[in-house]
């Protein structure tokens, strides 16, 4: 119902300047001045930006901003693609395309395989959800694990230093190749060199003359920067100035430490090792290191190991050594004459082990074979290739540090406190997902060996004891050496051979009549040995360690003289 008005002036009117009336709002003098000021300010800003862009620094910053804008645009487009995805598989595909190629390609291949299999089953009238389950379950967990893994390296200090010094490639270090690492190392060394000069000037260096006090202070600042980049500074323990330090820092080491921190070759090695370790942990988090995919180490790392080994062989074959008398010999012959030759290294290990066996027989000691495994939280992947729900993001180095610094250190402390004597050898092996486990051959007095085994067992299962229940064999296994079955040397020989030289364990299995297969990987012994050696080289793991005996260096020197 419409209200009727007797007079026109009684009807409601719109406010002046409202939309739809066609009556513009009156423009004041102040608004005119503000508009003119804004236009003039924008003109001056454009002129200043154009002048700054013409400088080398401005050009470099603009290129960096353009790259960042391009990346942001890619992320936005990927986000739009996910919103428009028709299902979980399409959404997973859109997310996978954002990953680096070494992560993206194998995951996309597996997802595409599952989708084709699912579509084939559905055409046959079967209910199949393999691709959807993989996309909603496994891939979602993989994305979370990758974020957690990257967070271990992309710390606030790491990000801050990379952004402040314009070393943006540090944020994408796992994706770089050797040439790019070389360029980044040169830029990093130059940054440390210029920072050292600024620090010296700031600490009071006059006329280019440096005192030890000024140099030491500058080194401390550079060392903190290197630690932010996950690189251990040279001679850090000897040059630290902590309050708890009992003696003065060894200043004679300062020149060498500064030269290394400002050397491109030193940074090239450090950054390459960091890149390889970071990249391998990403692949472990993506379940690409397992019995189902690539046991012990990733296929990417295995290819790098094979290429480097071939490069080393070509280098050794290309050079010869000549002494002052004119005698020449191939460099390859000299290289493989020492313990670098796996055959010689195995012979030395077996000779030492046989010596321990003979010593134990003379002393009347008994031998026991132990297997120690890390808790479940250190294992990234289950045997069927699925993400381990108990994994806490621990790296391979974390599992090794647990066995060395937590388990073995606690056992030695306990045995020393109780006055118990043991000696033997420990061998380090990878599980299928790259996690470390130990095999130990222990010799001890017959009256003490049971106590030693008991202490070792209690410490091995102490952490996360609740996950074991009544069965402790997943964490700790013990087998007393039975003379009727073999000697201590024969017990450990297989584990020494399978981590050094496949010829020691290769051949035909007498039980099956077929080539021997490694039960841990399901592959031939030759390939398993190659993968174990590549795993140890990648993570810089000490595969064998004798304990409770004097150093073998004296024996090596006497053998060399003989």
Predicted regions and their residues:
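Right-hand nucleic-acid polymerase module
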Residues: 1-434, 446-562
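Short hydrophobic/aromatic beta-strand micro-patches
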Residues: 441-445
């Amino acid at each position: 119902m419409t209200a009727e008005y007797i007079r026109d002036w009684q009807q409601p009117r719109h406010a002046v300047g409202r939309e739809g009336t066609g009556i513009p709002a009156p423009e004041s003098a102040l608004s005119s001045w503000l508009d003119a000021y804004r236009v003039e300010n924008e003109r001056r800003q454009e002129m200043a930006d154009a002048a700054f862009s013409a400088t080398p620094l401005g050009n470099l910053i603009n290129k960096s901003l353009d790259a960042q804008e391009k990346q942001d645009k890619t992320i936005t487009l990927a986000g739009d693609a996910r919103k428009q995805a028709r299902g979980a598989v399409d959404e997973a595909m859109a997310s996978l395309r954002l990953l680096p190629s070494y992560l993206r390609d194998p995951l996309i291949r597996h997802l595409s395989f599952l989708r084709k299999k699912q579509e084939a089953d559905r055409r046959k009238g079967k209910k199949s959800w393999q691709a959807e389950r993989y996309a909603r379950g496994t891939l979602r967990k993989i994305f979370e694990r990758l974020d957690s893994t990257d967070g271990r390296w992309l710390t606030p200090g790491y990000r801050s230093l990379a952004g402040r010094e314009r070393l943006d490639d540090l944020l994408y270090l796992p994706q770089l190749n050797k040439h790019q690492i070389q360029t980044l190392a040169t830029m990093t060394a130059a940054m440390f060199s210029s920072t050292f000069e600024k620090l010296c000037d700031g600490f009071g260096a006059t006329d280019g003359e440096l005192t030890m006090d000024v140099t030491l202070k500058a080194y401390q600042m550079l060392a903190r920067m290197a630690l932010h980049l996950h690189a251990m500074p040279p001679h850090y323990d000897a040059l630290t100035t902590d309050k708890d330090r009992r003696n003065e820092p060894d200043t004679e080491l300062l020149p060498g430490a500064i030269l290394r921190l400002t050397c491109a070759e030193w940074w090239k090695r450090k950054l390459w090792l960091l890149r390889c370790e970071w990249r391998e942990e990403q692949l472990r988090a993506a379940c690409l290191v397992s019995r189902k995919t690539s046991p012990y180490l990733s296929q990417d790392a295995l290819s790098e190991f094979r290429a480097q080994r071939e490069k080393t062989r070509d280098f050794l074959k290309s050079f010869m050594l000549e002494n002052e008398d004119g005698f020449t010999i191939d460099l390859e012959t000299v290289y493989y004459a020492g313990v670098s030759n796996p055959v010689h290294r195995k012979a030395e290990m077996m000779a030492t082990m046989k010596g321990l066996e003979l010593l134990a027989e003379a002393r009347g000691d008994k031998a026991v074979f132990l297997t120690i495994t890390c808790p479940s939280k250190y294992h990234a992947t289950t045997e069927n290739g699925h993400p381990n729900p108990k994994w806490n993001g621990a790296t391979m180095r974390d599992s090794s540090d647990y066995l060395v610094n937590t388990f073995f250190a606690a056992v030695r402390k306990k045995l020393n406190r109780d006055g118990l004597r043991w000696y033997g050898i420990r061998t380090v092996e990878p599980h299928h997902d790259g996690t470390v486990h130990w095999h130990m051959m222990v010799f001890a007095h017959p009256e003490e060996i049971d106590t030693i085994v008991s202490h070792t067992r209690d410490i091995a299962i102490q952490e996360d004891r609740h996950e074991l229940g009544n069965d402790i064999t997943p964490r700790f296994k013990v087998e007393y050496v039975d003379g009727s079955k073999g000697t201590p040397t024969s017990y450990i020989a297989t584990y020494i051979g399978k981590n050094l030289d496949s010829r020691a364990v290769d051949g035909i299995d007498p039980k099956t009549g077929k080539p021997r297969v490694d039960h841990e990987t399901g592959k031939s012994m030759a390939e398993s040995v190659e993968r174990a050696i590549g795993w140890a080289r990648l993570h810089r793991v000490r595969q064998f360690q004798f304990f409770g005996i004097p150093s073998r260096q004296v024996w090596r020197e006497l053998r060399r003289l003989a």
